[in-house]
Amino acid sequence: CGESLGLASITVAGGAADCVMALTSSHFASAEKEFRFPLEYAGQRPLSTTWTVTGSGAFVIAAEEHPCSTQAHCCISGITTGKVVDYGIKDSMHMGAAMAPAAADTIRQHLIDTGRDVSDYDRIITGDLGSIGQTILKDLLSDCGILLGDLHEDCGMLIFDPDTQDTHAGGSGCGCAATTLAAYILPRLIRGEWKRVLFLPTGALLSKVSFNEGQSIPGIA
């Protein structure tokens, strides 16, 4: 979600295109089969796991002079592209811990690059760290003197109801950030409840082979 939105924005801002659609999706059963265990295996899920969201989101990014822009209610004012951060996490059932360091690094770098403070944002929203990843993120940023407090939300914690849906640490997957952006974040920007949001989709760079070989899982945001 974040990569497609970033590339679409760069393409439009650079004049290579006037209108670009950024689309992404994920599927629970496909992710389980590919990166964990087939559903038929009925393996027990540790409490640190997240539940891959079955969902999709699409967004149209258009140049100011394009007809689509007349329907726009918000804009992408800037992008901070994160870097790969590897803390040596090897457990594919603990993705929040693998991605949180990358999220912390990108937030810190974004604030440095823009000269802003966390208080300049109505919300800072990460993609799919889950409840455990959120705790790690806040601890890492606190060590740098950055206190998120109640400004931080995570799509993985928003998309499911922890009281009625047992998804353990929360939701995950490309569709998690995309559907939350489309159904939760953008409507609040359109209604004027929020003026500025730092949206930070998170990702893990693993394959179905690498983690089975005991390799670490780098994260990016």
What are the roles of these predicted feature ranges?
Residues P38-Q109, D113-R116, I146-D166, R191, ...:
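Condensing-enzyme catalytic core mediating Claisen C-C bond formation in acyl metabolism
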Residues L129-C144, V209-I217:
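Short glycine/threonine-rich loop-to-helix capping motif typified by GTGT followed
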Residues T24-K33, G82-K83, P201-L206:
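Acidic, glycine-rich active-site loops and adjacent beta-strand->loop/helix elements
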Residues A102, R108-L140:
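Long, repeat-rich segments with strong aromatic
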Residues C1, L5, A13, T49, ...:
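Generic structural signal for well-ordered, non-membrane alpha-helical segments
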Residues C1-A22, F59-E64, S172-E193:
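Active-site-proximal alpha-helical scaffold in enzymes
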